[in-house]
Amino acid sequence: MQKKSLLIIGAVWVEPNSSAAGKRMLQLITQFLERGYKITFAAASQKNEKAIDLISLGIDAVAIELNNASFDVFVKELQPTIVLFDRFMMEEQFGWRVAENCPEAIRILDTEDLHCLRKTRAFCLKKQVPFSVDELLKQDITKREIAAILRCDFSLIISTFEMELLKNTFKITDTILMYLPFLFDEITVKQEKKMQSFEERMHFIFIGNFFHKPNIDAVLTLKNEIWHLIRRQLPKVEIHIYGAYMQQQIQELHNKKEGFIVKGFAEDANKVVESAKVVLAPLNFGAGIKGKLTEAMLCGTPSVTTSIGVEGMADNFPWNGFITNDFSEFALKASELYTNKLIWKKCQLNGIAIINSLYSKEKNALLFFNKIEEIQRNLENHRTANFLGSLLQHQTLQATKYMSKWIEEKNK
């Protein structure tokens, strides 16, 4: 057995230029590589041209199949010391196989964001009813995701809001939860001075992965509710819409006369964000930390967003711009930020303070690996204390296991 080896079971192959989730996964991979781990990345999805070359990083890339005993042979031979599940669906599919074949491996769930929270909010928005915890508790996806969290040795939670929700609403002990936001190098004064100035920047920007429904909704909100109000105050300004997997529905919004410019995939997201003056993100639903907003801070670009956008991202620090759920006020604040250099600069510095205080790679990664070492030293006691997790491992996964075996036989 490798002294330090990690198996990552990915929902998709790693695409850091397409999504915040891809960036997050690459951040985690980098931390394990820096600590001398031998890494194997396995996924059952199709690889495309946007996926990075893992082999060039010294990582073994392995294609696996759902509901197939070949995974048992593979994982038993590999015997990793840690298994990281990329989102709860991967734990549902492969968790029981890992538990059976590698009982000593620490099982970590990277939630990315709480899918149950995002899906329930989308459901409530569609039904035009207010989001409530009661509605969250009714959803099947909530039961599935919470069960996966309980079955793992610990789970990575990306926002402070989600940490509080899991502890207070679902009564999950923080011994099996770990707050781990995005991991960034701190921004130095020298780097801040090199950022493009207020005068050098032009236009508004929105950037996001359009596989992600909150991003589609946000761009439609910009087009239908907000942009005409901004143009009334700033008739020559443009908004540039960037993102991976852009559907025709979004492409058709392009209107040069109105200054609503749909650009498509950005090869270098940093470059386009740091040359824009303001990021607009009118998010009506979603969960977790918003990559577009941390990217804005890293690029020194202030933003206007909603309470959903900022949720769990800034603790008690003043925001990197403005927060409002009212479309008229959103347009006013966007125009103010675009035209007022003093306010713009103050908001830029707020963003730098948030990155350096809350998203420090050095500080957060140290806590993460301390947690791993602590559990490795006391794995048996840690699992004994998580009785509900043991119960679910025993009961729920028996059903999952035999359903999977039935599908396996059926596929032969």
Region locations from a protein language model:
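Acceptor-binding helix/loop patch of EC 2.4 sugar-transfer enzymes
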Residues: 15, 104, 109-139, 199-200
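Short hydrophobic beta-strand element within catalytic cores of glycosyltransferases
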Residues: 292-295, 302-306
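Nucleotide-activated donor-dependent transferases that construct or modify glycoconjugates
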Residues: 2-18, 25, 66, 204-208
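Conserved acidic donor-binding segment of nucleotide-sugar-dependent glycosyltransferases
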Residues: 320-328, 336-341
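Acidic donor-binding loop of glycosyltransferase active sites
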Residues: 80-81, 274-288, 301
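C-terminal amphipathic helix plus adjacent low-complexity
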Residues: 350-412
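Conserved catalytic-core segment of nucleotide-activated headgroup transferases in glycan assembly
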Residues: 168, 172-270, 274-275
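A short, active-site helix/loop in glycosyltransferases that binds the activated sugar's phosphate group
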Residues: 93-94, 142-174, 250
